[in-house]
């Protein structure tokens, strides 16, 4: 039996949430290679949080390293990354909706890869699923996203010069998801 990609979330979902879950499932296949193969195999209760956590990290990473069709300054990228964190910290606020729409409106100009651009343009759907998660899961997700964001921003502002730097950067972008998964 193949596990449901939506886990427990879909059983209590309204139409907008089901549509958003369907989008997230499609987006995962579009923007990921290895995680698109493994996330659907996780037990039902963890599927939606892991999928959404991955997509949110992918959005953050897009502003870190997909510099787009025009030069996007370091300041603009940092501002966008901080806006993502503000959205995730207060996902139910009007500010979150407004900032998600602002990021979506900048995607055509800022994001070169068409799949990542589509994900940023549909941040509202990822946010809809995020909102449906329990408070403990959201708090854990935000905590680890802060860690990822801090590391990404550090290495946006300074190159990786040594193996020690590389080790630290790898922790921020690859080790932190393990912390989130452990807390789940």
Model-derived features: positions:
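Acidic catalytic motifs of isoprenoid enzymes
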Residues: 1-184
